[in-house]
Amino acid sequence: MSAVKMRNRRLNTADSNADSTPELKESKQSQRKTAKERQTGCRSLLVLRTRRIALLLCTVYISVPVVVYLFPWILGHVIFLHLLRFPFFADLAIPSEFLNYTTNFHLSPEEGVSVGVWHTLPVSQWEQAEGRGPEWHRGTLGDGRPVIIYLHGNAGTRALSHRVNLVKILSAAGYHVLSLDYRGYGDSSGEPSEAGLTTDALYLYRWVKQQSRSLVFLWGHSLGTGVTTNVALREQQQGSRVDAVVLEAPYTNMGKAAECHPISMMYMFIPGFKSLLWKILEMNNIVFPNDKNLETLASPVLILHSEDDNVIPHHMGQELYNIALQAERARNAGGHVEMVTLPASLGYSHNHIYMDPSLTTVVGGFLQRVKQK
């Protein structure tokens, strides 16, 4: 037993002596040096990449205002977002994929422009609509039921889910609903502009008025609220008056709305950026002055706005309500301006006011008061 221990001791001593040879020491030092160099190299590479990314981000940040100024049409595309044709691959010529008892047709508001429209029947007409053609559907606009012309916001088409869901609710409540894709949107030809969108909606409104024997009112959402008040004011200037106007998530004017955009807010601290933004909008002839329009608009107005709207702040809807109310009082009129605020706790945000269970009651009550005037 002791002999084994002695032999193990001699082996350990030999190993220890071997470990301490100059060649092995040099090898270990070389390995440690290589590891440190590798670690230092990794740190240097990480710092270099971080600097490059930071430089790229700074370049992009600085170049955005310059590029938009040099190419002002870019801002127009950002505002209209008409090239984002959600839902992709939707066949707008077959509305039955999205809505029951809905016909698709096109109108030509001016030469070279064709706009797509869906006409959704009130639920009460569905049974009679079985097997009927487009002419019969058009004739139903004269059945005495109210007609809503829905003017949607930017991006997407009339087939976008929150738009379709609103149409379903309004149809169930007994309204004819006509959903328009402005020029450049969906299956409509042409390029969007404020003047063009207004022309398209005005043409549809006048076309419907020729068919209908009941109230015809405009329902604008987001970008569409500017189109709505433009149309209503244009009609008023021609000696007529839109029966009623519903503004869902409206903005005061496009300049103010653009200032509130998250991208714009990143630049607001830069001197001169705000005036540059307004100048570019002016170059694009994009104003959509809801505030100015409501100062003179005589049509009844209902404003719907959610407190938690993360696109257009609720205070803009409140400001428009105050403007319209003051204008109404100046005309010694009553009952023509109403506003409904949806609490933030409901979570409707910008696109989901249609989910409110009292929506049709609110709209129906408003229209009933309009009829009594």
Q: What do these predicted ranges mean?
A:
Residues 2, 10-29, 314, 318-319, ...:
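C-terminal catalytic histidine-bearing segment of alpha/beta-hydrolase fold enzymes
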Residues 42, 110-207:
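Membrane-embedded segments
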Residues 2, 54-108, 113-134:
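An N-terminal hydrophobic leader/cap segment in hydrolases
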Residues 220-224, 228:
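Gly/Ala-rich beta-loop-alpha elbow adjacent to hydrolase catalytic centers
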Residues 151, 182, 247-248, 342:
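Alpha/beta-hydrolase
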Residues 296-297, 303-305, 309:
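Short beta-strand/loop motif that positions the catalytic acidic residue
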Residues 230-299, 351-355:
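Hydrolase active-site cap/lid region
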